[in-house]
A protein has these predicted regions:
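A conserved structural/catalytic subdomain of Rossmann-like adenosyl-cofactor enzymes
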Residues: 1-174
Length: 175
C-alpha cells in the first residue's frame, strides 16, 4: 500500500518462477518506483523467458523476452511523455531486431490486459488490496479445443484394440 499511496510506483516486471535457480525457485518481480510522488497507473510486464533455461543449469536458450521488455518500456515512457534512457546495449538491440524486424507496434496503448505489457489504474490496484501479483490483473485467453465426436474416437480405439489383439495372437503363434 505504501508503494502505491506514498510513492510513485511505475512498473511491476513479473519474472519467471525459477529465474534465480538453483538459489530460489520462488516467483519474483522487479518493482520500479520513485520515492515520493504519486501513482496514477502502473505498467505491468509478464516476462516469460529471460534467455536461459529455468532448470538448475540455466543454459542459454533461443527465447528471450528481455529485448521486447526494454523496447516496450521505452515505448510506454515515450507515449506518456516521460524521459527515456538509452539503456539498450548493442546485443539487446540486435536480439530485438531479430525477433521483431518491424519493431514494436507503435499502435500499442497498453490497455489490452491479455498482452505481455499492460497498464493498471491505481484504483484497480487499491480494489485488489494493493496486491501486485500480475495474475490479479492479467486476463488469460483460453483457446477453445475442438475434438472429434466421441463415437468416432471410440470406434478408432476399438479398431486399434483389434489390431493389437491380432498381433498378440500372431506373436503367440510364433512361440
Amino acid at each position: 500500500k505504501t508503494l502505491v499511496e506514498d510513492n510513485q510506483l511505475e512498473a511491476v516486471i513479473n519474472l519467471p518462477s525459477g529465474v534465480f535457480k538453483p538459489y530460489a525457485g520462488v516467483a519474483t518481480a522487479i518493482l520500479i518506483f520513485t520515492k515520493g510522488g504519486q501513482t496514477d497507473e502502473v505498467w505491468f510486464y509478464d516476462l516469460q523467458n529471460d534467455g536461459y533455461s529455468l532448470d538448475d543449469k540455466r543454459n542459454p536458450i533461443k527465447d528471450n523476452d528481455l529485448p521486447h521488455l526494454l523496447a516496450s518500456w521505452k515505448h510506454y515512457r515515450t507515449l506518456r511523455g516521460l524521459p527515456v534512457d538509452n539503456f539498450m546495449g548493442e546485443k539487446l538491440a540486435s536480439l530485438l531486431k531479430q525477433q521483431y524486424p518491424e519493431g514494436i507496434d507503435a499502435g500499442v496503448d497498453f490497455k489490452d490486459r491479455t498482452q505481455a505489457a499492460f497498464i493498471v489504474p491505481k484504483e484497480d490496484i487499491a480494489a485488489q488490496k494493493y496486491d501486485l501479483s500480475i495474475n490479479r490483473y492479467k486476463e488469460v485467453v483460453y483457446q477453445a479445443e475442438e475434438y472429434e465426436d466421441p463415437k468416432v474416437i471410440l470406434k478408432r480405439l476399438k479398431d486399434l484394440e483389434k489390431e493389437i489383439l491380432a498381433d498378440l495372437d500372431e506373436l503367440e503363434g510364433m512361440l
